[in-house]
Amino acid sequence: MLATKTKPMIVSMGPHHPSMHGVLRLIVTLDGENVIDCEPILGYLHRGMEKIAENRTIVQYLPYVTRWDYLATMFTEAITVNAPEKLTNIQVPKRASYIRMIMLELSRVASHLLWLGPFMADIGAQTPFFYILREREMIYDLFEAATGMRMMHNYFRIGGVAVDLPYGWIDKCLDFCDYFLPKVNEYERLITNNPIFLKRVEGIGIIGKEEAINWGLSGPMLRASGVQWDLRKVDHYECYDELDWQIQWQKEGDSLARYLVRIGEMKESIKIIQQALKSIPGGPYENLEARRLQRGKKSEWNNFEYQFISKKPSPTFKLPKQEHYIRVEAPKGELGVFLIGDDSVFPWRWKIRPPGFINLQILPQLVKGMKLADIMTILGSIDIIMGEVDR
């Protein structure tokens, strides 16, 4: 019998299309169908977001931040206004805080929905993809009614939000919550006990509790490994403490556990939204003191005073000479910003801590020794957005 000597084969997976897992390239070393090594190549979507922040005022920078994680844009906006608010100690009115909380949780549901669809499509189940688009469209309709934009909302402002909720919006949102909860249960009936689905995800990509902490994982990746850590409970930001909700977690640490955590989070988010809508207080939707506008010189037009309203300068809002790290619980994990001010209107340093980038580091270790087909399952369960990974 002749022994055949096989050399390991090196395959380049990607760069994928932006609509799938973003422009991520994996250089995979294969022995037959077993993965020996995997090296992620990043940087195809690098746009220098941290450097751009250093020569923009906070308000000028707001439209840029929605391009990090472009499926959960409310969170990037929240962190961008929270950082200077904490640095300069600006109080946010209660109504504004509630509006922010509702928007953040709607954004979380939309993000998890758009994780679930492609994840199931990767495994081979095409149907849920069309279901989730139907529900996600409704969330985007709510966003459009409140902010004017479906995706890049540009809604948060320093000291509050841009505009109040329109008349009838709260009822529409409550209707959506009543419609959506049975739909999540329908997803669970379709997916969770499906034998083919379970074969593809059970025991695939296991991360232990210690390992998850040592790798610095956060979000559903960490909570699926048995760590009950949610920044909404830990950091007590906005008004989450006033509502009744539970941290979703699992102890198995495999791809199935990560799926279950995200499904549970969608239900909890709807619970939070319902409570917030029912107990939203009145009052102002922004802190007017935060709008320290520099009065622009009025331009003369045909000898009478005429001011272009839209040409008012950005708020010349000085960041004091301090440094501060602020974080929020984004759908993918801990999204943080380390901000250093130096007494000017521009930040001196704006360091972004993206959850996707740090969660992705564990991928090579998870896929070693697995089959080639399991790479997509594991990559899908991590939930990355390359705009945020590459910045």
UniProtKB/Swiss-Prot annotation:
Domain of life (superkingdom): Eukaryota
Gene Ontology BP annotations: photosynthesis, light reaction
E.C. code: 7.1.1.-
Cellular-component GO terms for this entry: chloroplast thylakoid membrane
First-level EC class: translocase
Cross-referenced PROSITE patterns: COMPLEX1_49K (PS00535)
Keyword Translocase: yes
Subcellular location: Plastid, Chloroplast thylakoid membrane
Keyword tags: Chloroplast, Membrane, NAD, NADP, Plastid, Plastoquinone, Quinone, Thylakoid, Translocase, Transport
Subunit structure: NDH is composed of at least 16 different subunits, 5 of which are encoded in the nucleus.
Biological role stated in the UniProt entry: NDH shuttles electrons from NAD(P)H:plastoquinone, via FMN and iron-sulfur (Fe-S) centers, to quinones in the photosynthetic chain and possibly in a chloroplast respiratory chain. The immediate electron acceptor for the enzyme in this species is believed to be plastoquinone. Couples the redox reaction to proton translocation, and thus conserves the redox energy in a proton gradient.
Similarity comment text for this entry: Belongs to the complex I 49 kDa subunit family.
Protein's UniProt name: NAD(P)H-quinone oxidoreductase subunit H, chloroplastic
Organism: Physcomitrium patens
